[in-house]
């Protein structure tokens, strides 16, 4: 143990607090890798990993052995975990067997590749099986849970009918690679956008028919929804308890979902104790071996929490993430694309945000993730408005509120400062002129929450809250010799470092020339320099530029 601690202090090993084990630091992993040719070695190593619960590592070793029988056996034993293990499982599409486990793996493979006809075939195949065992029903529930064209109400009815005979069931994953249970593998807004009586009925059904982990996910989804519709006072104590009672031994997806919700609450009501807990959760997550855990932690940390405290880091995160935009969109990275789109909107880089939207909008429509889609459509409206394309802006706003009109989202519309407020004002003014009958009646303001309001009152409420929100200002956090740069100044400094002219900066950031010159003058003053070369050298000295 002393040797391990010494190697940890030297940076050769890293301690994984969640799994309570040591692993090689990323810097040394390539150096430590050795090539082995014996398939027996890889089988034995894979079996060891499998026996200790490390499914991804087990399959990596067994694939290196080249023995399909061993790969098949491992996947069947761990069929619930394989689709979410972060490793390819395309072998399943070649298998001819029709046992429930194989049907599940094939169905999830089809789901991830948007082959919904293939997903339906596996569900039909399962329903035709003579076996009435609980495993088959549980697999059907998991496959229909991710089926985009199956309503949540219909799925709940299926769950209830199965549970009457077979007891409680498990969902193998609710989150996928999302950070919010409200919009993971399935959008759950429908559970809460209803009367309190109906919500309680669904909550009771969820609790009675599913396990403890699933109810924890339900509570976090409900908390997220009530924060989104600005009803934090209506949040139930048991939902807060799910966050307060968490430990660093919980699986990483749950810890990340907690971190996201705390960051969201922090933007509404800053609290140093919550900020400290967010930092603690981050420390437990950054050493996870799952790449997308670390990437999503970084995105949440920069976009929802640290952008107010570490502006340079926020802009550097955006800059360094641009390479990801060349990748194909999939279940692993769609949330990162969503976060990057929002980040680019916040610093006026509309062209980059729009490139993301071209991929992300059809993807979210395909999987019917209403919660994320409504916000992306609002972002698209902001881009059109800034480009003076009024008709396109109106179309995007209509599409966004067609979703929000049902679920009554609020916060997503008030987080964009003056940009968002201008779009809301223009859209509501257009509605007043085109549909006067709904806007000129006498309003009442004691509905209790947005779910009870007529559509016109709901939209007026969103606009009123957007006006109340001040333009996003990034406060100084310390009093170093050099004043902190704003996000825009940091981005411009990065452009100066690659030799961009003022005209090129104007085009990239969608700014006018006097505005760019003003930012450059301001960053010169803050860095105490007189020209571009000195500014770049100072930026490197301070660590702003890499």
Language-model region placement:
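Internal alpha-solenoid helical repeat scaffolds
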Residues: 97-259, 263, 273
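Extended alpha-helical scaffolding segments used for macromolecular assembly and cargo binding
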Residues: 37-113, 118, 122
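Short capping/hinge segments at domain boundaries that bridge a core fold to an adjacent linker or tail
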Residues: 4-47
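Structural motif corresponding to the intra-repeat A-B loop/turn of tetratricopeptide repeats
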Residues: 52, 65, 113, 229, ...
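Residue-level signature for tetratricopeptide repeat
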Residues: 48, 61, 74, 109, ...
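Linker/hinge segments immediately adjacent to helix-turn-helix/homeobox DNA-binding domains
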Residues: 337-373, 377, 386, 394-487, ...
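Alpha-solenoid helical repeat architecture
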Residues: 56-59, 68, 72, 131-143, ...
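Helix-turn-helix DNA-binding segment
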Residues: 471-521, 525-527, 534-546
């Amino acid at each position: 143990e002393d040797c391990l601690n010494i190697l940890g202090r030297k940076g050769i090993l890293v301690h994984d607090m969640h799994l309570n084990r040591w692993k090689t630091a990323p810097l040394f992993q390539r150096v430590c890798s050795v090539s082995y040719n014996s398939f027996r070695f890889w089988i034995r190593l894979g079996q060891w990993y499998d026996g200790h619960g490390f499914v991804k590592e087990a399959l990596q070793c067994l694939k290196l052995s080249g023995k399909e029988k061993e790969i098949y056996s491992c996947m069947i034993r761990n069929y619930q975990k394989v689709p979410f293990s972060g490793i390819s499982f395309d072998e399943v599409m070649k298998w001819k067997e029709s046992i429930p486990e194989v049907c599940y793996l094939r169905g999830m493979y089809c789901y991830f590749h948007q082959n919904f006809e293939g997903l339906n075939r596996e569900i039909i195949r399962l329903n035709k099986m003579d076996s009435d065992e609980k495993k088959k029903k549980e697999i059907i529930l998991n496959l229909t849970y991710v089926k985009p064209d199956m309503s949540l109400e219909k799925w709940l009815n299926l769950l209830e009918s199965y549970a009457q005979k077979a007891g409680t069931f498990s969902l193998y994953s609710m989150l996928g690679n999302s950070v919010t249970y409200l919009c993971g593998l399935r959008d759950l807004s429908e559970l809460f956008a209803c009367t309190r009586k109906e919500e309680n009925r669904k909550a009771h059904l969820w609790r009675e028919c599913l396990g403890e982990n699933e109810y924890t996910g339900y509570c976090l989804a409900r908390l997220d929804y009530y924060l989104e519709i600005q009803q934090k006072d209506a949040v139930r104590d048991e939902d807060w308890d799910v966050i307060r009672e968490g430990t660093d031994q919980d699986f990483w997806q749950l810890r990340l979902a907690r971190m996201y919700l705390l960051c969201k609450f922090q933007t509404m009501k800053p609290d140093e104790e919550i900020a400290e807990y967010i930092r603690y959760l981050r420390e437990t997550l950054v050493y996870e071996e799952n790449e997308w855990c670390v990437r999503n932690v970084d995105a949440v940390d920069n976009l929802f929490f640290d952008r107010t405290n570490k502006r340079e880091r926020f802009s550097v995160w955006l800059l360094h993430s641009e390479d990801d935009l060349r990748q194909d969109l999939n279940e692993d990275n769609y949330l990162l694309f969503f976060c990057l789109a929002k980040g680019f909107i916040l610093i006026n880089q509309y062209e980059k945000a729009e490139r993301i939207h071209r991929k992300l909008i059809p993807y979210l429509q395909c999987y019917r993730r209403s919660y994320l889609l409504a916000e992306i459509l609002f972002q698209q409206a902001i881009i059109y408005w800034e480009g003076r394309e009024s008709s396109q802006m109106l179309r995007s706003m209509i599409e966004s509120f067609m979703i929000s009109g049902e679920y009554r989202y609020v916060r997503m519309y008030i987080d964009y400062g003056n940009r968002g407020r201008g779009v809301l004002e223009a859209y509501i003014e257009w509605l007043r002129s085109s549909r006067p009958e709904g806007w000129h009646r006498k309003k009442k303001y004691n509905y209790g929450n947005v779910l009870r309001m007529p559509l016109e009152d709901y939209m007026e409420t969103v606009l009123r809250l957007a006006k109340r929100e001040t333009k996003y200002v990034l406060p100084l956090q310390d009093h170093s010799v050099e004043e902190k740069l704003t996000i825009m100044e940091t981005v411009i400094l990065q452009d100066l470092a690659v030799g961009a002219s003022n005209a090129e900066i104007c085009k990239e950031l969608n700014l006018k020339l006097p505005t760019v010159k003003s930012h450059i003058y301001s960053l010169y003053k803050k860095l105490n320099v007189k020209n571009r070369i000195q500014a770049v050298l100072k930026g490197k000295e301070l660590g702003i530029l890499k």
